[in-house]
Amino acid sequence: MVHARRTSLAPLLSGVTALLLATATAQGNNVPAQAQVINQKSFNVLGDVPPPTVANYSTLFIPPGTTKDSLFEKPFHIYDEEFLDIIGANPTLTLLKSSGTNPMFHEAAVWVPSTDDVFFVQNAGDPAAGTGLNRSAIIQRISLSQVTADVSAERNATGKVDVHVVVATPAIINPNGATNYRNRILFAGEGQGSRVAPALYVMSQNAPYNATVILDNYFGRQFNSINDVAINPRTGDIYFTDTTYGYVQDFRPENVIQKQVWRFNETSGAVAVAADGFNMPNGITFSPDGHHAYVTDTGVIQGFFGRNSSFPSSIYRYDVEEDGTFSNRKTFAFIATGVPDGVHVDTKGNLYAGCGDGVHVYNPSGKLLGKIWIGSTVANFQFAGKGRMVILAETELYYATLKAEGAFPGQLY
């Protein structure tokens, strides 16, 4: 939808909030025009806490003294002063496109530096999209050359950036995750029915978008529905998550193999398990130095089977050993609104996660620094070099400017 003009509501500044603002001002970091401080202490005690039927993973939390409109009016939410260095002096958020009820802006966000294009895909398995079993989700792209300074200065710039459908040859079936890889785009395909196996595909970055399958089995066995993919910056090995969202969204068979994280070396052909013990392994990324891996578990969402709030909505951090295996699992963060889907890091090692109300930002220790608040689900997003980010909010496509820089521009191995 196209957002109506929002009326600003001044935040209630007291206690920790006032102290945070005073500290920021003393350091010369005034709160930017599109940012606001959120005082977590102000809602430590609510008095009347809603029952789980009212407040759960699927509901937005509106802090006391704010409204949904005021939260969106100033969408860069500061939970810790470190966030000021991430967003910079003048962060902006711009709506580029809206698709009604069809979730056209879902995942697989990839920025190609040589063309300044950003690729992304439609949601596979969503009833509103009609994709999954009978029709594959599609790949699309935009050119950031169309996002001029005048466009990014607007809050609503719908109609000013063109979205193009990308037709790969042969077709990439139900693409979901993606990353740059060896001057190509590496896609995770979820498969379709029992005969079209989930697979890893590589596609050229330019037309005619030739595609090749590089992996579609483990010793003759299909994967469940490959969800996301990342490259270890130390070794160039491919890591991918395999989960059962294809099954719980009715376009893949029931569990065919354990849900886990896999490691693949395209040069040697070796495929091995990197980690297991998940309910629904989903997003994956690495720290800038490749010594740590982050994996999300979105088990609380079970597709057409509903939800189970006792299942994970968590981000886990691992050490990555010299041999590429994962060890020392640590619970890095738990998400209250929605689930942590796509994850990425900046050059300083801060972790960004697409969640149920926007993009959450954590420092390397797991402290919540701030949010880019959309007010709806962000399945994924991607840095486009320094100071730019494209955000996929299912039926809405956003462009943000900030100070931070993505850790793996191009990520060409």
Model-derived features with residue positions:
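Beta-rich, blade/repeat-based domains predominating
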Residues: G100-T115, T169-G193, Y218-I238, Y245-G246, ...
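Blade-level signature of beta-propeller repeat domains, shared across WD40, Kelch, NHL, RCC1
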Residues: N380-Y413
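Beta-strand-rich domains and repeat architectures in extracellular enzymes and scaffolds
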Residues: A35-A137
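Fungal secretory targeting signals
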Residues: M1-Q27
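Short loop/turn segments immediately following beta-strands, especially the blade-tip
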Residues: I142-S152, M203-A207, R317-G324, L402-G410
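Blade-edge beta-strand/turn elements of extracellular beta-propeller
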Residues: I78-G100, D150-P170, N206-R221, Q260-M280, ...
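Short, conserved, GDST-rich strand-edge loop motifs in beta-rich repeat architectures
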Residues: I62-G65, F120-N134, F187-G193, Y239-V256, ...
